[in-house]
Amino acid sequence: MKPKVFITREIPEVGIKMLEDEFEVEVWGDEKEIPREILLKKVKEVDALVTMLSERIDKEVFENAPKLRIVANYAVGYDNIDIEEATKRGIYVTNTPDVLTDATADLAFALLLATARHVVKGDRFVRSGEWKKRGVAWHPKWFLGYDVYGKTIGIIGLGRIGQAIAKRAKGFNMRILYYSRTRKEEVERELNAEFKPLEDLLRESDFVVLAVPLTRETYHLINEERLKLMKKTAILINIARGKVVDTNALVKALKEGWIAGAGLDVFEEEPYYNEELFKLDNVVLTPHIGSASFGAREGMAELVAKNLIAFKRGEIPPTLVNREVIKIRKPGFE
């Protein structure tokens, strides 16, 4: 009898097909997030669970899932899962690193360029008919933005995604500063990057890009005090997690001109609505689409399947998050 896996959202077909050879697969087919009460019912009979970053997988879920042995998170981050509780119960947790690195780094640079050069504002100007209404083909003072080539970028968090952003910055001949919990001297040499204390990085950078995981230490890492350290011409880009930035402080900074602009792909609450923020024209907003390329999302689905199949065969999953769990329970559904 095949073990049962429940997938909380429809993922690319390539991953589902891989799983169907080894598992009894059920997929929540609604576009909307699965209601909590339904999730708690569905997990009662499953051996494996594939989750999205928008679902809270905590003690309550585990208590309702007596057969659950592995949670495969369809994301690189896993702050939506109570890792300590999972480990205590002998439940393996996996994620999907690497396969979405380039797509997320691309989006960081897309936001950086779009914000610096008023791409979205220009698009609205054309679509609204305002350009035609003005009756002027070109004006030397319209949509003046900030140069990117040769400027200074400060990357907070130099993991896989942070390094990929730095490689793109190198192509723009940018001075690369970074702040991380630990210095990475080999990466410094490879990318000609400079390690800086956080406050110095904020003072010196023309563009500040956040690429850190959400932890107790990084919650509201960018607050009012630190926003005031940035240049008035600086632009903040967040492709990390929304709660790394104090949104109220950021709105104040954008309204009062402490910084020039922001590009945000992540928010403190998602889906997100903030009337004050949405009124501002010096911010570019996207709905958490960092990994939203065909290649990245299919790669994530394949990695989810590979993790579950490896576990079923008694092997350690390739991207196991909580390695301590191996001491508590061997991989496999037996």
Swiss-Prot record:
Signal peptide limits: none
Pfam families assigned: 2-Hacid_dh, 2-Hacid_dh_C
Main location, first listed in the record: cytoplasm
InterPro entries linked: D-isomer_2-hydroxyacid_DH, D-isomer_2_OHA_DH_cat_dom, D-isomer_DH_CS, D-isomer_DH_CS1, D-isomer_DH_NAD-bd, Glyoxylate_reductase_GyaR, NAD(P)-bd_dom_sf
Nuclease listed as a keyword: no
Catalytic reaction(s) noted: glycolate + NAD(+) = glyoxylate + NADH + H(+)
This protein's UniProt keywords: Cytoplasm, NAD, Oxidoreductase
Annotated active site: R241, E270, H288 (proton donor)
Gene Ontology CC terms, in alphabetical order: cytosol
Positions with a binding annotation for NADP(+): L158, G159, R160, I161, S180, R181, T182, I239, A240, R241, H288, I289, G290
Compartments where located: Cytoplasm
Gene Ontology MF: a single term: hydroxypyruvate reductase [NAD(P)H] activity
Enzyme class per UniProt: oxidoreductase
PROSITE patterns per the UniProt record, alphabetical: D_2_HYDROXYACID_DH_1, D_2_HYDROXYACID_DH_3
Keyword tRNA-binding included in the entry's annotation: no
Enzyme Commission identifier(s): 1.1.1.26
Top-level division of the source organism's lineage: Archaea
Family, similarity comment: Belongs to the D-isomer specific 2-hydroxyacid dehydrogenase family. GyaR subfamily.
Subunit structure: Homodimer.
Protein's recorded name: Glyoxylate reductase
Gene: gyaR
